[in-house]
Amino acid sequence: MRLARSENRAYQLRLLEAYPLCQICERQQSIECHHVRYGRFGADKDDSKQIVVCRECHQWCHAHKKGSIEKYEEVADENWQRFGDC
């Protein structure tokens, strides 16, 4: 599901407010949102599939894309159920 840019940003801000720690390692430094499902250059990006991660875990997710999708999609789905009503 693609959201309008403003809706996606509102959703990301809700996630970052709700989760001040990385949802993978629970560190607090440099947290940001990561799209669990995304395609090359944004093709097939699913804005409803996002988790909050620190910079290190974000890099790990991109380096291990296949494993991270399966591992964190359930967390992303729970996030959307809780905060997806932008």
Task: Label every PLM stretch briefly.
Residues 2-3, 40-52, 59-86:
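Polybasic, low-complexity binding patches
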Residues 12, 35, 66-69:
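Broad hydrophobic/π-residue packing in well-ordered secondary structure
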Residues 5-32, 56:
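Short cysteine-rich loop/turn motifs with clustered Cys
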Residues 30-41:
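Short recognition patches in nucleic-acid-associated and regulatory proteins
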